[in-house]
């Protein structure tokens, strides 16, 4: 896989152990060779924002508002406990069975000439999860594409373009409020992502929309720790579609593994 400044974020966050990133914001973790972590103010100043003004952490995870960013910072810098599905207040952050079978979305006409690439990649990326769990159905509603924003209440989420982002794509979790439920895609970076196909990149992002965290937040990865708000579903899988390759991952193309399939099936049937 060729070296590039922007990594799947699928992100330009600077993990100190990652050779794929040359610049980026400070991490809230202790830096090698030091006894200090950055202050919240330092962390806040160095955290990127997306066009909607949301902070982007852990590569492709949006956080709305300074108070929520502070909660995230404190969770990362506080004591690690044994608490990979996202959790909110100790509960799995997943869709209800009925909603999981009706995950409607639109693809914005603003993608222009690149729209068909996104439509096709969303369909094939969604298909990877749907084939693994009978309780999941992503439903494309093209009639909503002309008004495809988070304000459209006719769909669960929107897929919209972004330019000059510090990530290839970013998504949301089931617990996100409706104004935050969109998948943003930088098409130029998506098309230049090397071994990471558009299908696999968008499947990774759709994994987040189903409630799945980055696999490398687990201690077995040895780097790129994010926080403790998760529950393991399967044994650690360094080749997971949810594992950044630059965080001691063993997959070069973000393909889905059997452990990924078993994990999603354990939640969505």
What spans do the regions from the language model cover?
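Disordered inhibitory propeptide/activation segment of secreted metzincin zinc metalloprotease zymogens
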Residues: 29-117, 229-234, 266
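Secretory targeting and sorting signals
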Residues: 1-29
């Amino acid at each position: 896989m060729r070296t590039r400044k922007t990594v799947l974020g699928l992100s330009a966050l600077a993990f100190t152990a990652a050779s794929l990133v040359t610049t980026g914001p400070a991490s809230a973790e202790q830096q090698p060779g030091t006894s200090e972590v950055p202050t919240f103010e330092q962390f806040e100043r160095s955290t990127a924002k997306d066009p909607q003004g949301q902070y982007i952490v852990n590569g492709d995870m949006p956080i709305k508002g300074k108070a929520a960013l502070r909660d995230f910072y404190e969770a990362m810098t506080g004591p690690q406990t044994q608490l990979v599905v996202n959790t909110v207040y100790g509960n799995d952050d997943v869709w209800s069975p009925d909603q999981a079978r009706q995950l409607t979305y639109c693809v914005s006409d603003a993608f222009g000439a690149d729209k068909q690439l996104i439509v096709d990649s969303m369909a094939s990326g969604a298909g990877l999860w749907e084939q693994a769990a009978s309780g999941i159905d992503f439903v494309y509603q093209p009639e909503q594409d002309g008004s495809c924003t988070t304000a459209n209440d006719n769909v669960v989420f929107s897929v919209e373009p972004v330019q000059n982002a510090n990530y290839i794509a970013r998504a949301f979790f089931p617990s996100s409020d409706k104004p935050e439920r969109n998948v943003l895609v930088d098409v130029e970076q998506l098309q230049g992502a090397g071994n990471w196909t558009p299908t696999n990149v968008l499947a990774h992002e759709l994994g987040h929309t189903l409630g799945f965290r980055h696999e490398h937040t687990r201690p077995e990865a040895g780097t790129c720790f994010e926080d403790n708000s998760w529950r393991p579903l399967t044994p650690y899988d360094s080749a997971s579609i949810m594992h950044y390759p630059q965080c001691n991952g063993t997959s070069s193309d973000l393909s889905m593994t059997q452990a990924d399939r078993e994990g999603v099936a354990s939640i969505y049937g």
